Amino acid sequence: MEQEQDTPWTQSTEHINIQNRGNGQRTQRLEHPNSIRLMDHCLRIMSRVGMHRQIVYWKQWLSLKSPTQGSLKTRVLKRWKLFSKQEWIN
């Protein structure tokens, strides 16, 4: 398997994290902070979108199961407006 060569792009995006251990050894870890940050950001947005969809779904479901007086009133008014528009057209 070929080793990846360092290009200016990888050199600029890679972050070298050097840690000193108690016994004097130094360990080196390569990180890609930009890609890690981007992935975290995407996951956060996706989870927010999922939560929003669930909330909208449950609100719709709850309004169907136990409609409040206000939601019934708006539904009836919407249907009445649609019905009266069709009457005008016909």
Swiss-Prot record:
Region of interest called Disordered, as start-end residue ranges on this chain: 1-32
Positions of the record's site feature: High pathogenicity: S66
Keyword check for Phosphoprotein: no
Its biological purpose: Plays an important role in promoting lung pathology in both primary viral infection and secondary bacterial infection. Promotes alteration of mitochondrial morphology, dissipation of mitochondrial membrane potential, and cell death. Alternatively, inhibits the production of interferon in the infected cell at the level of host mitochondrial antiviral signaling MAVS. Its level of expression differs greatly depending on which cell type is infected, in a manner that is independent of the levels of expression of other viral proteins. Monocytic cells are more affected than epithelial cells.
Misc. comment: Is not encoded in all strains, and seems to be dispensable for replication.
UniProt-listed InterPro entries: Flu_proapoptotic_PB1-F2
Record localization: Host mitochondrion inner membrane; Host nucleus; Host cytoplasm, Host cytosol
Keyword annotations: Apoptosis, Host cytoplasm, Host membrane, Host mitochondrion, Host mitochondrion inner membrane, Host nucleus, Host-virus interaction, Inhibition of host innate immune response by virus, Inhibition of host MAVS by virus, Inhibition of host RLR pathway by virus, Membrane, Modulation of host cell apoptosis by virus, Viral immunoevasion
Residue ranges of the TM segments: none
One cellular component (GO) term of this entry: host cell nucleus
Annotated Polar residues bias: 1-27
HAMAP family per UniProt: INFV_PB1F2
Membrane among keywords: yes
Mitochondrial targeting sequence, as annotated region: 65-87
Subunit structure: Oligomer. Interacts with human SLC25A6/ANT3 and VDAC1. Interacts with host MAVS.
Family per record: Belongs to the influenza viruses PB1-F2 family.
One GO term of the biological process aspect: symbiont-mediated perturbation of host apoptosis
Designated name of the protein: Protein PB1-F2
